[in-house]
Amino acid sequence: SSTGFSLQAMDSSHVALVALLLRSEGFEHYRCDRNISMGMNLNNMAKMLKCAGNDDIITIKADDGSDTVTFMFESPTQDKISDFEMKLMDIDSEHLGIPEAEYHAIVKMPSSEFARICKDLSSIGDTVVISVTKEGVKFSTKGDIGTANIVCRQNTSVDKPEEATVIEMNEPVSLTFALRYMNSFTKATPLSNTVTISLSNELPVVVEYKIAEMGYVRFYLAPKIEEDEEDTKPQV
């Protein structure tokens, strides 16, 4: 749209959703004459983006009504220009309007610390219980070889704000999530020094990484219900 570029994707089991926003003012040049919605295969898009050099300038172009989108990669010295045209997909589902919710607990912590916790716990178990109380935020798991508990207490007396752990809690929360999804989410760690985790009982967790001066990427994951059988999963 004229205000920015937004992307949504959901996994096949409808348990996880990713929402990306890049605001128009963050681009060097941005023009959108009318709102346009495009269906893209993420694997195919990733293949094309991997053809770009680390310092290339990327231009994305699409015409209204066209069944393709063009990715143009220009080297910094402008001595090499590559054009890749990708076929679009027909996707029935509309862009989801995700309502803003009031969360019982919001945890802001270093993104590298969150990634390390998820990686460490996944060597013990398949799920993580995230509990927020006035004591702090606790990440727990159990598996065949034993159990693990990691507690992060509020820590705002750090010189560097990006290394602080800040917890806002209206009421205690305890929810269980699949670690394989959490580990996928932490691949966004290089985007931001901090991650914000928003939790409410019965609602999907929101794991948000801010993209400096441009927008954010948010991951939504439905909690696991312990009594449920493996094949009956709650949906986002």
Swiss-Prot record:
Record GO cellular component, one term: PCNA complex
Main location class: nucleus
DNA-binding region(s) in UniProt: 31-50
Keywords for the protein's UniProt record, in alphabetical order: DNA replication, DNA-binding, Nucleus
Subcellular location field: Nucleus
An annotated Gene Ontology molecular function: DNA polymerase processivity factor activity
GO biological process: leading strand elongation; mismatch repair; regulation of DNA replication; translesion synthesis
Keyword Isomerase: no
Domain of life: Eukaryota
CDD domains for the chain: PCNA
Stated role: This protein is an auxiliary protein of DNA polymerase delta and is involved in the control of eukaryotic DNA replication by increasing the polymerase's processibility during elongation of the leading strand.
Family, similarity comment: Belongs to the PCNA family.
Protein name as annotated: Proliferating cell nuclear antigen
Species name: Glycine max (Soybean)
